[in-house]
Amino acid sequence: DGPGMRTTVFLKGCNLSCFWCQNPESQSTGPELMYFKNKCIHCGCCINECSQGAVQLANGEIYIQRSSCLTCGACAKVCPTGAMEISGRAMSIEEVMQKVLEDKPFYELSGGGVTLSGGEPLLQKSSVALLKAARQNGIHTAVETAGNLPLEVIEKAMPFVDLFLYDVKCMDDDLHKKVCGASNKRILQNLKFLAKTGAELCIR
């Protein structure tokens, strides 16, 4: 996710729905309850803790009624094996930067820095403020993006991005719509724009 030793900040929310998404929990903007079946010992702690009856045991297996789940995290707190986990939490720029700055000596020694990933990190308005804060602290910045964004969003981020890690999923527009859920026209237009401006790009 960029040169040297880096801290990757994953931001939730994505406007694509790629079949092969490696971080499907990052597609929605809000926190989500994740269940790891291989970690579950069927102790029933989560069932007893859920006030909504969203966690149930049927045929010897744990099931989650997503329509009833409040994503409160009560089940995850009592799970002894980590089979239940909340993915995503709200953090301020200051809180994120506190974590990022912990590894600043490693960035300086290795030529590393911070990488924003996701999801599509630039969908979050606070992403530019986070990039700016990193730059103000002398930290190299990279953004992993699919580029499916209004051009003005990219333009706002550009002054604070040292490297764009640009994910081109598919060149054929019809196939892109089929496997990613959206056209690639804007993605390729934004890529051409970045290339013309001389922005540092790594196309993947």
Language model features: what each stretch is:
Residues 1-45, 62-71:
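N-terminal pre-triad scaffold of radical SAM enzymes
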Residues 60-61, 67-68, 89-95, 99:
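FAD-binding FR-type
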Residues 4-6, 52, 59-61, 81, ...:
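Short, solvent-exposed beta-strand edge segments and adjacent coil->beta transition regions
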Residues 94-204:
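Conserved AdoMet/S-adenosylmethionine-binding subsite of the radical SAM
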Residues 19-26, 45-63, 74-89:
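Iron-sulfur cluster-binding cysteine motifs and their immediate structural context
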Residues 18, 40, 50, 69-75, ...:
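Hydrophobic packing within well-folded, soluble alpha/beta domains
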Residues 11-14, 24, 66-67, 87, ...:
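Fold-independent oxyanion-binding glycine-rich loops
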Residues 8-10, 56, 115, 142:
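Short, conserved beta-strand segments within well-ordered enzyme catalytic domains
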